[in-house]
Structures are given as structure tokens and as C-alpha cells.
């Protein structure tokens, strides 16, 4: 099952995962990696081996893996993210289905700069790039090894590197209907530590035909181990759940999806306190994202 949602990068689930609904021009599905947490999703594309992917989203805040990333949840700065990426089919099975892929994208965040953001370009506060090698040994099973570099063009944060292993099960059975996914990440440059994420994303069609809207109910549990969130932070955990409404459209010859998503982050005491003083220390944080994703 190809998922029809894209997660908001700061919400640690549905961002990262990009997905676009099927359309008359869609000929195959390729895997895709989220820049924030390295989770896998599927995205419908056209024929051929090279597939550009573009997305734009607007959010009420920027949170990464349950913790404040740059912007608190509110309408103070309203960050905008532009992601450019793609997938290349390297190998096909005897039936023509893609089995080995190179995938990647660069997600770039922009907002109204704060007084402390003095390095030009002041508004460009993050640039997260991930590249991976994905393998589909059988239909409905996708694995990937990926490497991400997360930088701050305006110098507000230090550059970090991460290595990840990721898995997605999307076969046409009862378990595949839940679209379970898991990723394990080790930070190779920065604070260090290990991060694990486990999520599901059951999806429901709200009509008949390929142009029908869909409703997805994502749910995730993420754990940062060994001071992943901050030096001395220990092991921290959060959960995320909500809903994503997506409608397939045609834009410039691309298979596209317009999406609206609402998530609730639920953090443990140690994780929520890490947000002070720049963000809320509430246990529950509401996040909303509107996005457009296009794939060729």
C-alpha cells in the first residue's frame, strides 16, 4: 500500500514521510526517506527510472522528534519548508518492478528571523539533507540505509550527522494495512546517542476512484537514548498521534497531493523541560501543517 501523506518534518512522523496518491499517470511506486527521522514511505510516480519530487509546507511550529527544533507551536513565525529530492531506480526484478533505489531529499526551513539570528541568510535557519540506498526484496517490504547531514545556514545551530536503518511493511494484508515502520538512528556528529521510532499509519479512502480524498491516522512512539536530545538528558520518550487529510490533484503534469495534518505530541517530563526557555514546556503540544507534494 502506498501511503498518501507527507509528515511535517518537525512532528517526527508523517514528514517525513512523503507520499502522493495514485493518479492516471502514476505507473509505479518508489520508496522515500524523511529528512527528520529517516522513516520510509512510498510515493507514486510515473514511468521511467528518474523521479524528481518537490514539496512545500507551512506549519504552526517546528518540532523534531517531539522536542522544540526552532519555532515554538504558535503563529509567531510560521516556518515554511521547501523540500527537493527524488528517487532513481537502479535495478528491476524480472517482472519490471523496481527493487533497488537511490533516494534522497533536502528540506530547507525559512522563517522570520529572531534577534539572535544575525548570520546571513538570516531567514534560512535549517537545511536537512538525507541520501539512502533502499531495497525491496519482495512486494510490500522496504528497507533502507541512510545518512543525513543537518545544518543551519544562518548559524543558529551546530551541524550534526546521522546514520540510520529504516524498515516499512506495506503488503496487502491486515498488518500491511497499518503500514508499520521503524527506524534506528545513531548520531555520528553532534551530541551522540541513539534514536528509535516505531509508527503506524492506517489509511482510509473517503470515496471511490483514484481522485478520492484519504484520511490517515498516524501514531508514533519515539525514544532518544543515551543523551540523544541533549548532553545529560538520559533516555527520553514521546508519542504522537493525529490525522491527515489528503486530496490528489494534477499540477504541471505531476502526481500531486494537497494535505492538511493535525498532530498532538505527548512528551515525558524530561523532554518537555528541555524546551525551556525558548518553547513551551507543556506535556501536550498541538501541531498543524498544510502541504503540497508533487512527483514526476
Question: Can you annotate each of these PLM segments?
Answer:
Residues 86-92, 133-135, 149, 167-171, ...:
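Residue-level signature of outer-membrane beta-barrel architecture
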Residues 64-72, 112-122, 156-162, 192-197, ...:
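Outer-membrane beta-barrel translocator domains and adjoining extracellular loop/strand segments
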Residues 24-114:
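Short glycine/proline- and aromatic-enriched beta-strand/turn motifs that initiate or cap beta-hairpins
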Residues 217, 241-296:
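Predominantly the C-terminal beta-signal and adjacent terminal strand-loop region
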Residues 48-50, 76-84, 123-129, 157-163, ...:
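Residues that define the transmembrane beta-barrel architecture of outer-membrane proteins
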Residues 40-51, 89-101, 121-123, 136-142, ...:
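Short loop/turn motifs that connect adjacent beta-strands in outer-membrane beta-barrel proteins
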Amino acid at each position: 500500500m502506498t501511503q498518501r501523506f507527507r509528515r511535517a518534518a518537525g512532528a517526527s512522523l508523517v514528514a517525513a514521510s512523503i507520499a502522493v496518491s495514485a493518479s492516471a499517470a502514476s505507473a509505479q511506486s518508489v520508496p522515500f526517506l524523511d529528512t527528520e527521522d529517516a522513516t520510509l514511505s512510498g510515493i507514486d510516480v510515473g514511468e521511467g527510472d528518474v523521479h524528481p519530487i518537490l514539496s512545500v509546507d507551512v506549519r504552526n511550529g517546528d518540532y523534531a522528534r517531539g522536542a522544540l527544533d526552532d519555532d515554538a507551536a504558535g503563529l509567531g513565525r510560521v516556518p515554511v519548508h521547501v523540500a527537493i529530492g527524488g528517487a532513481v531506480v537502479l535495478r528491476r526484478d524480472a517482472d519490471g518492478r523496481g527493487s533497488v533505489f537511490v533516494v534522497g531529499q533536502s528540506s530547507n526551513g525559512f522563517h522570520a528571523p529572531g534577534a539572535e539570528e544575525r548570520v546571513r541568510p538570516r531567514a534560512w535557519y535549517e537545511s536537512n539533507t538525507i541520501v539512502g540506498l533502499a531495497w525491496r526484496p519482495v512486494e510490500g517490504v522496504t528497507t533502507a540505509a541512510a545518512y543525513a547531514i543537518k545544518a543551519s545556514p544562518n548559524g543558529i545551530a551546530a551541524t550534526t550527522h546521522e546514520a540510520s536503518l529504516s524498515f516499512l511493511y506495506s503488503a496487502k494484508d491486515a498488518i500491511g494495512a497499518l503500514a508499520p515502520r521503524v527506524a534506528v538512528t545513531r548520531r555520528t556528529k553532534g551530541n551522540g546517542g541513539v534514536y528509535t521510532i516505531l509508527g503506524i499509519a492506517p489509511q482510509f479512502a473517503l470515496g471511490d476512484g483514484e481522485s478520492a480524498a484519504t484520511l490517515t491516522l498516524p501514531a508514533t512512539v519515539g525514544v532518544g537514548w543515551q543523551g540523544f536530545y541533549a548532553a545529560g538528558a538520559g533516555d527520553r520518550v514521546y508519542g504522537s498521534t493525529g490525522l491527515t487529510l489528503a486530496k490528489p490533484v494534477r499540477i504541471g503534469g505531476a502526481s500531486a497531493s494537497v494535505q492538511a495534518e493535525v498532530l498532538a505530541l505527548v512528551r515525558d517530563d524530561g523532554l518537555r523541560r528541555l524546551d525551556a526557555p525558548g518553547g513551551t514546556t507543556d506535556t501536550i503540544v498541538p501541531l498543524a501543517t498544510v502541504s503540497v507534494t508533487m512527483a514526476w
